Amino acid sequence: MNPSHGGDDKQRPAMYPQVDQSIPDNPFASTNPYVASSPYLYPSLSSHNLGPNLFPDHGDASNDQSPSAPPQATEEVLIRVPGAILNLIDKSYSVELACGDFTIVRIIQGQNIVAVLANVGNEIQWPLTKNEVAAKVDGSHYFFSIHPPKEKGQGSGSDSDDEQGQKSKSKSDDEILNYGLTIASKGQENVLLVLDQVLRDYSCFTEQRMSEKAKETGEEVLGNSVVADTSPEELKGERKDVVEGQCAAYWTTLAPNVEDYTHSTAKMIASGSGKLIRGILWCGDVTVERLKKGNEVMKNRLSRAEKEKDVSPETLRRIKRVKRVTQMTEKVATGVLSGVVKVSGFITGSMANSKAGKKLFGLLPGEIVLASLDGFSKICDAVEVAGKNVMSTSSTVTTELVNHRYGTKAAEATNEGLDAAGHAFGTAWVAFKIRKAFNPKNVIKPSSLAKSVSELKAKKGSK
């Protein structure tokens, strides 16, 4: 209140002390006369004097939206190859996992490629990264290796079989999953050339060839004629059973060789050598015993009950892990596309400051700026935390039934982990609930990220 205003102020003293209008920091004055007549107490600061924006908001349109609006994300199909069969490569029996179109999609958020995912028949998914092997054996056969994410803190990890398996062998074959992809390649030669280029761009790709000795010795099992002479349309008809039997026999025969190759290649990639084993493939050492095993698988068309007996406990554990990898990719795709997680150059800023997030991002801030499968796993972890926080209070979540092919034991393994935090992520209403419950302000502090980037540059400069 200004005592100089109004006649009543002359009749009685003011209730409050008079404010000196010459004080430059006067919050009550509409204008500050001191500023016009005297220099500033503090130097002016121009935006041109500031450094570059380390944390830009991609897309100007997002600035006009509410804080809870998800960042723009798109899914782009890079290639679709019909007539594909996917097997889990295993020494005892290479179980068929899916049949249908083989699709590679790219998920883009803003200017960043967040993930590249491979999918067969909309049943099995896995990420393609530069530190995971993708190998071409011939015109119809490819195999992929992936290191499944660590299963710490997951509910499904309490399974007694899993615990026993993990205790018995810390460095087991189960640490690497090997997928065998067979393509009905008749009439698809040009499409496969494009596929090879996509794999070169987004994975650790190498072309191999089988030795002539292996081809001659195991022509019936390792031959390519059945699949090469089958088109995607023919795979939907009577030839499907024949091709499926050939696929199971082929990958069962080569299972030990594939595992040896992927393990040795993984060590090379981890060491940073950047070199791959090229030339005549390990298939020159296919043993007579393995060829006999392949012949048995191909000739004996097992019933459902017989298949169940033939699936070993190790195979069951691998099937469970295959499902978890699929769920991981679904969570990343759904989380990014629905706005649950915002990713900037593989920096996940959604849950990092929460207690659960700090447990997941134990390396923050020094090693959070990561690419490849490790960065992909961290994105998945952030979505996992967000999803579990919402789903733990929901009593209405139901799970899908899975089309099981290999008896009750294999079915139980396949169904493992299909709970509220798993396949339920595929429904739109769940994604909406997660987005609604998500706190968009709970992000990594810019100072932490700036420190992380500077430390990373310092390390590179010292090398």
Swiss-Prot record:
InterPro entries linked to this entry: Senescence/spartin_C (IPR009686), Spartin-like (IPR045036)
Comp. bias regions, Polar residues: 19-31
Pfam (any one): Senescence
GO cellular component, one term: plasmodesma
Span list, region Disordered: 1-31, 52-74, 146-172
Biased composition (Basic and acidic residues): 1-12
Domain Senescence: 269-437
Name of the protein in its database record: Senescence/dehydration-associated protein At3g51250
Native source species: Arabidopsis thaliana
